[in-house]
């Protein structure tokens, strides 16, 4: 497969306008490790001004809407990410005495929609107890940023709380309390900020392999890790209003390896279930796939930025994928993805967690619907 072509568009006075002279694009979505706190997606674009930055583009400023598109087929481009400009910095190149012209570079930093919530004062809003769906509607009304909790068919409840910090802090604690993931790189029909239930695991349409056939995607780098943050023998889950639940693995001695979580769980029973789930998940050290990396150019059929046929990179956190390595297939869940593109090459890195660290029973699912293969989720 040949090089992929990407374009970065900014919102101008009469619609989106493509940037020119792009030197590189770097994009990061999701997290790298399962227990890492959710964070806004980010992107960085470097462009060159061969005639100098004397007349900068007026719209290149904080808050301007941007999109990154794959336009390899110009007649049918598709968005892989959306967000806003957070910063623009310019490095001015001094011309040489021999007559070489100015070499000015602008670095445009961008961020997903969750970042807006991180700067938005909660104003001590009294969030009523209720389903997460209803709480997200209230949060949307108060913040002005559309958001939703995407379930896997279950109904989750959230405790009453006062949003005394930022709306981003409330969303992050809600996600943590429910072991959920974040998607914030597109204005989807469900909202700009989506918290994804751990039961909402969407399978990729394609798989990864070191010896691919058909449309499977080929990777050339694979990493296995035994992360310290994936091993604890004591878990303590604190709630705002119902006390703390602490559970301990059997047969262990002090000093304990303790994972402490501050949640807004709706009851002590919910905290108990969460604590036991986390302990059962992480009480045994494991060596597992943590990431794989692949280039666009090595694919027979390129699908790396659209492995769910109707969605793109912004949709990846929470999707399941099979990775085949030396004849063994490992079911995994995507935690995050990064893309690094230059005119010479485009590389994607996928950060994953093993299916055994996502212990949920999802009926009729090829991986998570097998009894005796997974512990029940809380």
Task: List the predicted regions and their residue ranges.
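Charged- and aromatic-enriched interaction segments used to assemble
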Residues: 74-77, 94-228
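Generic detector of short, well-ordered, non-transmembrane alpha-helical segments enriched
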Residues: 33-35, 41, 81, 106, ...
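Extracellular/virion structural assembly segments
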Residues: 24-66, 114-117, 128-130, 301-314, ...
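Acidic, small/polar-enriched beta strand-loop surface segments
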Residues: 1-19, 172, 176, 181-333, ...
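Short amphipathic beta-strand and strand-loop transition segments with alternating hydrophobic
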Residues: 25-35, 86-100, 184, 335-341
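Short, compositionally biased low-complexity segments
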Residues: 34-40, 105-114, 245-256, 286-288
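Generic structural detector for well-ordered beta-strands
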Residues: 26-28, 46, 84, 109, ...
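Surface-exposed cap/loop segments at beta↔alpha junctions
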Residues: 2-5, 39-42, 48-148, 347, ...
């Amino acid at each position: 497969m040949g090089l992929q072509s990407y374009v970065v568009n900014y919102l101008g006075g009469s619609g989106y306008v493509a940037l020119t002279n792009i030197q590189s694009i770097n994009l990061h979505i999701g997290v790298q490790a399962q227990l890492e706190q959710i964070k806004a997606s980010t992107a960085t674009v470097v462009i060159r001004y061969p005639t100098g930055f004397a007349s900068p583009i007026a719209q290149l400023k904080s808050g301007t809407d941007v999109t990154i598109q794959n336009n390899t087929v110009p007649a049918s481009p598709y968005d892989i990410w959306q967000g806003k400009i957070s910063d623009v910095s310019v490095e001015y190149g001094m011309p040489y005495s021999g007559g070489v012209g100015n070499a000015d570079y602008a670095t445009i930093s961008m961020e997903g929609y969750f970042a807006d919530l991180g700067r938005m004062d909660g104003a001590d809003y009294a969030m009523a107890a209720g389903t997460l769906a209803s709480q997200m509607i209230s949060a949307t009304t108060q913040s002005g940023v559309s958001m939703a909790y995407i379930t896997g068919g279950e109904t989750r409840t959230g405790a009453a709380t006062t949003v005394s910090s930022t709306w981003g802090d409330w969303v992050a604690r809600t996600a943590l309390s429910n072991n959920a993931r974040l998607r914030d790189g597109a204005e989807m029909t469900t909202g700009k900020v989506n918290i994804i239930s751990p039961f909402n695991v969407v399978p990729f349409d394609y798989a990864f392999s070191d010896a691919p056939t058909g449309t499977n995607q080929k990777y050339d780098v694979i990493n296995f890790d035994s992360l310290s943050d994936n091993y604890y023998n004591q878990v303590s889950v604190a709630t705002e209003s119902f006390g703390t639940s602490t559970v301990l693995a059997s047969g262990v001695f002090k000093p304990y390896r303790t994972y402490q979580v501050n949640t807004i769980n709706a009851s002590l029973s919910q905290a108990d279930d969460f604590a036991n789930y986390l302990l059962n998940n992480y009480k045994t050290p494991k060596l597992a796939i943590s990431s794989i990396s692949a280039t666009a150019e090595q694919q027979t059929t390129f699908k790396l930025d659209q492995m769910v046929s109707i969605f793109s990179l912004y949709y990846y956190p929470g999707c399941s994928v099979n990775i085949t390595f030396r004849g063994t297939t490992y079911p995994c869940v995507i935690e995050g993805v990064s893309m690094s593109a230059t005119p010479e090459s485009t590389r994607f890195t996928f950060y994953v967690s093993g299916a055994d660290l996502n212990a949920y029973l999802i009926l009729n699912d090829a991986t998570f619907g097998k009894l005796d293969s997974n512990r029940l989720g809380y």
